[in-house]
């Protein structure tokens, strides 16, 4: 930030000792430290405010783009033409809709029953299966 080299810093320290004196130097350095701290605090607050304004502008811009894109999509696909995926076809009667739902659920039930059959078969081998001499007896 400030381009102060070692020689400039040494000159400033010598002048400060001569002007302020060694007795008042700690008080002067404390005061200078407080000023520098306040300057940093104000600078940080200012930078944070600018970052927040930039972030808000970006969010507003993205919101505007999102609204435009949403309007385009809604114009291409009007709401009256769209149906929910899980809703039955309105042309079907209630009985036909129930039957279609039951047919869709059958493969899942069959898979569950098959897994249960396999588990019970693993636990209790059939009597016709030969036993090896090393297998444990029930």
Swiss-Prot record:
Going by the UniProt record, its keywords in alphabetical order are: Cell inner membrane, Cell membrane, Membrane, Protein transport, Translocation, Transmembrane, Transmembrane helix, Transport
Task: Report how it sits in the membrane.
Answer: Single-pass membrane protein
Give residue spans, biased composition: Low complexity. Answer: 83-97
Stretches that traverse the bilayer: 1-21
Any one GO biological process: protein transport by the Tat complex
Q: Where in the cell is it found?
A: Cell inner membrane
Domain of life where this protein originates: Bacteria
GO CC term, one of those recorded: TAT protein transport complex
Gene Ontology molecular function: any one:
protein transmembrane transporter activity
Tell me the protein family, please: Belongs to the TatB family.
Alphabetical list of HAMAP family matching this protein: TatB
Tell me the function of this protein.
Part of the twin-arginine translocation (Tat) system that transports large folded proteins containing a characteristic twin-arginine motif in their signal peptide across membranes. Together with TatC, TatB is part of a receptor directly interacting with Tat signal peptides. TatB may form an oligomeric binding site that transiently accommodates folded Tat precursor proteins before their translocation.
Q: How does it assemble?
A: The Tat system comprises two distinct complexes: a TatABC complex, containing multiple copies of TatA, TatB and TatC subunits, and a separate TatA complex, containing only TatA subunits. Substrates initially bind to the TatABC complex, which probably triggers association of the separate TatA complex to form the active translocon.
Name used for this protein in its record? Sec-independent protein translocase protein TatB
Annotated gene = tatB
């Amino acid at each position: 930030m400030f381009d102060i080299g070692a020689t400039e810093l040494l000159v400033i320290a010598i002048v400060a000792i001569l002007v302020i004196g060694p007795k008042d130097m700690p008080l002067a350095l404390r005061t200078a430290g407080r000023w520098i701290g306040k300057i940093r605090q104000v600078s940080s607050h200012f930078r944070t405010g600018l970052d927040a304004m930039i972030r808000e502008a970006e969010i507003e811009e993205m919101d505007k783009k999102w609204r435009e894109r949403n309007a385009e999509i809604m114009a291409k696909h009007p709401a009256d033409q769209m149906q929910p995926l899980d809703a039955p076809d309105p042309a079907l009667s209630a009985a036909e809709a129930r039957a279609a739902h039951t047919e869709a659920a059958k493969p899942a039930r069959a898979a569950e029953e098959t897994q249960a059959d396999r588990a019970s078969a693993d636990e209790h081998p059939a009597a016709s299966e030969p036993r090896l001499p090393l297998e444990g007896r029930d």
